[in-house]
Amino acid sequence: MSHSKPDVSEHPQEASGVNSGISVIALLVAAAFFMEFIDGTVIATALPQMAISFGVSAVDLNAGMSAYMLTLAVLIPASGWAAERFGARNVFTFALAVFTLASLFCAMASSVSEFIILRIIQGIGGALMVPVGRLTVLKTTPKPQLIKAIATLTWPALVAPILGPPLGGF
């Protein structure tokens, strides 16, 4: 009587102890997506209050919004190269740390210039975080679980814009 173990490569979810649930990787990436998606709507509604604290008009802070979006647009194409070159896990971890720290420092910014620079740094993290996170989930999720994993990644994009305005001071 042979007691051979099943091939782990055929059923990675079973090997990790997760049978039909959502993978930890998908949940972690979904949380990162939520942070990035909520960020835009929180800041957009907080701009008037931020402008008062900086002593400028709200329009002056639009440069921070534009700097973030431009950084995303320029660096997203490099995210695939970075994941291949340095490893998706390393890039995602780096991006998550950069994005989170830049978000915290944005909240503590004392000038418009500081805010804009921190938004650029935050954009660097965001540009790497979302595409590399999605790539990681797609590469590590078994085919039968792919729809559930993609749904897990989609929910933050739907919920965060609803929660952002009240959190930002709507």
Locations of regions flagged by a protein language model:
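Transmembrane-helix bundle of Major Facilitator Superfamily
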Residues: 2-170
